[in-house]
A protein has these predicted regions:
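A structural motif shared across PLP-dependent enzymes of the aminotransferase-like
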Residues: 125-136
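Glycine-rich cofactor phosphate-binding loops and adjacent beta1-alpha1 units
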Residues: 171, 198, 214, 219-269
Length: 269
């Protein structure tokens, strides 16, 4: 099959690689129909990690189940599925407690967790390919309605929307509160949308890329362009001198100062 293969910093290639195969009876093989590029894929692409050449990128995946292991009960060949980016077993104590990111079966010592196509997160191939092996398929495959009408919407469920939503969970957003979202990339926009779903009264999205701020406005948020001045001052002016009740950082360690220098250790408080 064809797959996107990492060759080294800022170098990838579409190459022929071996087709994935059923290894365990709980596996399925999915034919990929949509896969997204994550900002964390770019971390590897830019050489910010110790990713080894040969890795296939892609942890935001969906597609059609093509082959099913004998131990799989909840999905069958032909099902459309979306695949949450974090691989987990579904039956350990942590998974049963809803803490699948800390799966006791998948998270081997010395790893950051389990994910498709990511350095240090297990032996799972990425989905920027024609086919993908999915372990523990009863837990890691989310069945979808038939048809392609909402293909682009469902692709957001693999990572982008739940990551944005989780940020509002961590922030504790409650109905009627005001919220500031720093960063209007895909995750930041989904954080703003999630805050809206949670009933936030006003949502401010800080960025300086015009089309991203336009998208924030389309979602019902109030765009704050930091090229126009201190974003904190702009927000407090809009709130009669008060700050927001909640905030979320959708920029991460690539946050930069006004000078353009990155400050990876900066924490918003």
């Amino acid at each position: 099959m064809k797959a996107v293969v990492y060759k080294g910093p800022r170098e990838v290639a579409v190459e022929e690689v071996d087709d994935p195969a059923i290894v365990d009876p709980t596996d399925v093989i999915v034919r990929i129909t949509s896969t997204a590029i994550c900002g964390s894929d770019l971390h590897m692409y830019e050489g910010r990690t110790d990713a080894e050449p040969g890795i296939t990128f892609g942890h935001e995946n969906m597609g059609i189940v093509e082959e099913v292991g004998q131990g799989v009960a909840t999905v069958k060949s032909g099902d459309r599925v979306v695949l949450p980016f974090n691989v987990a077993c579904g039956f350990c104590d942590n998974c049963r407690a809803g803490k699948s990111a800390f799966c006791l079966t998948v998270n081997e010592p010395g790893t950051a967790g389990g994910a498709y196509g990511y350095v240090g997160m297990g032996p799972y191939g990425g989905g920027q390919a024609e086919y993908l092996r999915v372990p523990f398929a009863d837990y890691n495959c989310v069945p979808l309605p038939a048809g392609e009408e909402h293909e682009k919407d469902f692709a957001m469920l693999a990572d982008i929307f739940p990551t944005g939503y989780h940020s509002t969970e961590l922030a504790g957003v409650q109905p009627g509160e005001t919220v500031a979202v720093y960063g209007a990339g895909p995750v930041g926009l989904m954080a703003a949308y999630s805050a809206q779903l949670k009933g936030a009264s006003r949502i401010f999205v800080v960025d300086h890329v015009p089309n991203r701020l336009d998208l924030a406005r389309d979602l019902g948020a109030e765009p704050i362009n930091f090229d126009d001045g201190d974003p904190v001052q702009q927000i407090t002016d809009a709130l009669d001198g008060f700050g927001t009740d909640r905030g979320t950082d959708a920029v991460g360690y690539q946050a930069t100062a006004a000078s353009g220098e990155e400050h990876p250790a900066t924490v918003l408080n």
